[in-house]
Amino acid sequence: MKGGRRITVVASEILGVPGTGGPGTADSFLAVALGRHGHDVELLVAPGRDVSPLSPEWERAFANANVRVRPLSGHRSVRPSFLAPSAHVYDALRSHPPDVVVADDWRALAYAALRSRQVGRSLADTAFVAYCHGPARVFAEAAQKVPDTVARFGEEVAQRACLELADAVVSPSEWLLSWLRAHRWRLAEPTYVIQNLSETVALGEAVQPAATGSRVRQLVFFGQLREGKGIRVFIASLRKLDPRLLDGIDLLFLGHTRSWTEEQVRGELGGDVVARVRSIRLETQLDRTAAIDRLKAPGTLAVMPSFLENSPYAVAECVEHGIPFLAADVGGTPELIADEDRTRVLWPPTPDDFAAALGPALASDNGIRPARPARAPEESLSAWLELIETVVPASRPPGKTAARVAVIACGGDSADRARRLAEQTRSAAVEVISAKSRAGGLEQATAEWVLFLDDDDIPDEGLLDGLVAAQAASGADVVTTAVRPSHDGGALLFLGDPGALGLIENQYGVIGLVRRSLASADSDWVLFARLALAGRRIVSIPDPLAEHGGRPAAIGNSPAEALAVLEAFETSDGRALRELPQLTATLGASLARREAAVPAATRRALRLIRRRLLR
């Protein structure tokens, strides 16, 4: 195309590094394909994964496509941890705004940038495409476990915001979009189902298909060696086979692992299987190219009995390279395979079903035929190119700017700071009210908007101007802001509306602009929780506009406030209540894993919450 666009693909991992999973493969192929078709592409890698040095193969591939790989480091302290990657990505994007950002939903990498655009601070001319590989909950289901950290829950709240604030959403499977809608995720429109790019179309190089038609001599468990990928299903299915079918068979476990060893695999297989097979090997450090070479050995049958998948590259690569396989009939996997081949190669992920599939395959002199793709690979490339060339940021006309703001200062230090802030504010007339309490200050306030300033709040010169502008851009009822904690000098970000997470900690904000008609004398946590539960819109600026000397309230340090927040949740019937079962399960799983390390006050508060929820 003429005049390619400036594209930034934001990823957590990329090809060229051992252990890269499906999302990293998809992001890498997309970046290369867009670069090869005339776009100016940067591949931005969020902190958390070392990508140096890249393998020579992928260093060449990126260079040949004119793709710049830019790994980010965590150059500043950011809390909470689940928002840190998005804060670093935001810093990078606003320094050189591209025309289009394609951001992986994994780890909510675009959250801070999208929130900044929503409140009118930056990136107004940048279009955002959310590339949806699956929220934290889907990954947890795939691993056959309940999410067991509060951080994962918070990450999912941020992921929800990303899919709502983007200009387009792309999923590689219809199944995932259906899952999101069934779980009441609000998705930006338009949404697209575009299958992940294949190696052939991304690199523009034809692949040599595997040699097939011979007896199976090598069985390969292909995928990460863990429960969710079905390793125990595979092992149990082998134990159910007629042992004679395993005579002379090589067993290969091909994928990365954190815990499985060859000794453990042999123990799980049992003596009868071990005695029959010719060899048992684990290959856990191969890169993608080397792994595919192993699978293309004559007489190989790949087995992928995962409990849940979105659009697995393991299956797609077998289809592309003509590698015979058996896979689980789950999630979006069937969408990759031609209708007429699905009943041959897809099976429920149980030992009995996979044993029933493996038996005939091992007994056949010709093995099994490879499966064909459901769609022509070129369709995905055409769809991506059309989207990238046409997507634009949604038009968001600004609302009415607040004309008058009352700053209610409850303390001697805060009163002095409020007066200085009033002198520095340019966008609104400021009424400074010095009062002994928030209630007393509200009685005196006449402005449409109020800002409570406590002694532990040290506002920047542009705090009020920033809040007023953000409110006009977003139309929110409450606008809070990130702050700099006095004790560490980093940045403390907030979700604004954290849903059910607001029950256990203040993720709303510690300083904010509120409509006076909605304000009350409650503490920040209680006030913002009640407003969010009542359906009022709360957004939080991702740039620190104040220093804060206190700690955000949470059940462990503010039990009285926690009780008031709990009572607010109990009387609500809003969206946050639908998230409580998942939060409760997450807390239970977290306590089961870490109970000994949890402070006694937190344990008592959590037990109180659980008792109240179970009434």
Task: Report the location of each language-model feature.
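Short aromatic/hydrophobic "clamp" motif used to bind/position activated sugar donors
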Residues: 450
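Nucleotide-activated donor-binding/catalytic signature segment of Leloir-type glycosyltransferases, i.e.
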Residues: 255, 264-294
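Conserved donor NDP-sugar-binding/catalytic core segment of glycosyltransferases
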Residues: 462-492
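Conserved acidic donor-binding segment of nucleotide-sugar-dependent glycosyltransferases
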Residues: 343-352, 361-365
